[in-house]
Design a protein with these regions (language model features):
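OB-fold/S1-family RNA-binding modules
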Residues: 1-68, 130-253
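S1/OB-fold single-stranded RNA-binding interface
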Residues: 46-52, 56-147
């Protein structure tokens, strides 16, 4: 049985991330009649595993619960919340696309239109300014509510779930700067922080997705300093600065 998960493995450490998942699945199926035949990714970097055995259906359900599940377009429902990740940020100016895991059509990402983004974030800035300031970047996990489903034209429209807006507001009014790190596991991040002598400068490591993390800096620590320290040690790993003061200045401009 081939299973496509919502979790993605990507970037310079794609192989290591796949090995992380392989190890976790191997532990999961130790006492079951199931064998992990293969693990890899599809064209959108979603993890694809092949499981065989009497318990493959049980394992499939367990994997979907742990790592998120893929969908068929016919199963989509309006006014329903779906988890996903931003894709192709910056490639168009009319909105942001979110990969919610539809696997039977390569072009069925959910579009959050620019007017809806402006309305929900209470901003009138250009899309590029909004995405850069709020770090709405590729691979950032988000939840969206589907508002319109047009299967004939392969078009889905959505808006951000309140969880996303609440997270943005929480970060915005928090006086801790953040460094977002995508495409690494927590052990890697912890290790690089310790080697660079900066683990004590991080107040909290928040897990946003399986391989997506927010490093919440101590009040006396600048996120740019952490980026300079661990960036060279994790080459090829996307990292983004979230600076509340800069965002507030933008909102008040």
């Amino acid at each position: 049985m081939k299973i496509t998960l919502l979790t993605k493995a990507y970037g310079a450490y794609r192989g290591r991330l796949l090995e992380t998942i392989r190890s976790e699945i191997s532990i999961m199926i130790t006492e079951l009649d199931a064998t992990l035949i293969s693990i890899g990714t599809d064209r959108k970097n979603r993890i694809v595993v092949n499981i065989e055995g009497e318990d493959e259906e049980f394992v499939s359900n367990a994997l979907a619960k742990e790592y998120g599940k893929s969908l068929l377009s016919d199963d989509l429902s309006p006014n329903t919340v779906y988890p996903g990740r931003f894709v192709d940020v910056g490639k168009v100016g009319y909105g942001l696309y979110v990969d919610i895991g539809v696997i039977d059509s390569p072009k069925m990402d959910a579009l959050v239109p620019l007017h809806k983004i402006r309305e929900q974030l209470n901003l009138l800035a250009p899309l590029k300014s909004i995405t850069e300031a709020f770090v709405l970047a590729d691979y950032l996990p988000v939840e969206v509510i589907l508002t319109n489903i047009d299967l004939y034209n392969n078009r889905i429209e959505a808006e951000f779930d309140q969880k996303v807006i609440a997270r943005v507001k929480e970060w915005l009014h928090d006086d801790h700067e953040r460094l977002l790190v995508f495409g690494a596991n927590q052990r890697q991040i912890e290790g690089k922080l310790k080697k660079s002598g900066h683990r004590e400068d991080i107040y909290e490591i928040e897990q946003l997705g399986k391989f997506e993390f927010s490093l919440r800096c101590k009040r006396s620590t600048r996120a740019s300093g952490i980026l300079a320290a661990i960036g060279p040690r994790l080459r090829g790993v996307p990292m983004h600065l979230f600076i509340p003061k800069e965002l507030l200045a933008m909102q008040n401009a």
